[in-house]
Amino acid sequence: MSEAQNKISGSGRIGYYVAESLEPVYREIAGLLGVSLGPNLRVALDADQEASPGRQATPSQAVPQHSAEMPNREKMPNRWLLSNVDAILVEGISLTRLKELLLNYSGQKTKPLLLVCGSVSGENSGFRLKTFSFSLGSEGSRLLMEGRDYTEKGVGEPSLDLMLEEIREVLRREVRNYLELPPIPWGYAYAMTLTHDIDILSLKEMPIARTFLGYFYRSSVLNWKRWRSGKVKTAEFYRTIWEMVRTWAAKVGLGQDVWQRALPTLLDLEKRLGVRSSLYFMPFPEKPGILPEHLREAKESAPANRAAFYDVAKYQTLLAGLEDEGWEAGVHGIDAWHDVQRARAEHSRIAVLTGRDKLGVRMHWLYFQSPDSFKALEEGGFQYDATFGFNEVVGFRAGTLQPYHPLNCQTLWELPLHIQDGALMGEEHLDLNREDAFRKAQPILDFAKRFGGAVSLLWHNQSFTAPRFWGEVYERLIAQGRKDGAWIALPRDVLHWFTCRRRCRAELSTEGTHWQISCALADREIIPADPSRSAGQSIPAAQSTRLDLADLSGPSDPLAPRIPPVRIRLQIEPKRVKSISVPYEVGQGYIDFPAQTLIRLEVEGED
């Protein structure tokens, strides 16, 4: 079979040629792009330059792992590396050495596409060259590790996703039959995670101090102001007054106070809506923790009202019941953000109560200090952090809708926070009415429809009762997500899906009009979940073996929901495709498939 008859191209045959300091961020960027990062050409070329005449150099970085014809890595010439990439990302480095090798390589019919981000030196004439105005590596590092300040212009736009989309558009246009893995679960438009910080479980447990008295201030003075401005309805205004009376009675042992009923109200709402969420509980009572350095003035200790006034150990039955009924219990951290030992203690406290070791965390009051906090949380044993967002506004602190691995971590996921109730409607922040709050948050969902990813919502349990009544906006955002076709799932399930996407390798092989797409993990074959939920069509053909993505996490949990398959996107004019062996969705200039061991296509005309 000649080379013309059997062509193979991988999902994202992308090499990179960047300054050494930018290598970690480019490895993470490859995961966000949905491609498997190929050779580090800077290292490979340095090795080639140092090799003695006639001796083959050994690249120190991994090459694409999906090619069936890949030679022995220890004997792999660097020219083979160049012939097996469709594009090379370049930033912060001279093109002179790369140009020399590319020009001298006569065996390569088509020179790789050079994607130049930011400033580079050296001549680049004669190449397939696309330049971008942004420095993807340096700006990506800043966004993923430090994040933007809420006062920065444009925090309401996912700046990193916008940069990545510019690169994707060039790859789709310039690389023939380009394969990618979009951050969009099969059968859905995007993912949505619902989360709740459980700061308070009961007012009557609290001393008559700032937080307790603050409730009465909000229920009287602010309640009146919000009623006069139309932010609460008349019935809600009077209900708030009545709840104040009931709360004073509860303080002396007569009945339940309003915030004792907040969590049951929240859970009943989610049962009615058929959704589940993650609830983050304070691990220890009466510990306010310490302040981040940028907030310290006279003392190190955080304000006393940052402490919890409930002992989570007394609620073990509640936490176990939540897990049994499909919710997720996590940690609302106190000092885990700055101290590994305290991170381990806070993790252990909730792990013992839930019987689960893989836990998420969100720091109370969003205390965080990058880059040290990421590492402390990873070494503390957490699976993911959900802190990276704003108290003051809604938007994109990390510039992306996608979960990601912080650049100084190996296992920790960061699940960025995008929409918070207090930022929208809190009197100390945007102070919007409910209609304006929904409209302010809706553009974030619109970006998710455009780019995929995972929208993260935070609603405190006390927001579902008097005097706030903010549950209406929460319910509307869930309804909008469903209308959009969002997969509303627990954070751990969403991260399971993104783990599958990172590990999935897709390969296209063509033989005349017969095409095949094969899928495997980086280290073994996979099997995704049932792809029957599809908005596209299915053309009968030879039955392919299905892949079960639950295989990634060991024995299946009988209570765990089905995880949707990874989505594979092939850039091809849909009218050329005559038959497909799996369900599919048609887009403008592309076709999407659910990940399968083998996908067969009959295509009109040889490529």
Q: What is each of the regions a protein language model found here?
A:
Residues 218-220, 296-326, 353-359, 381-391:
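Acidic, His- and aromatic-enriched active-site or binding-groove loops in soluble protein domains
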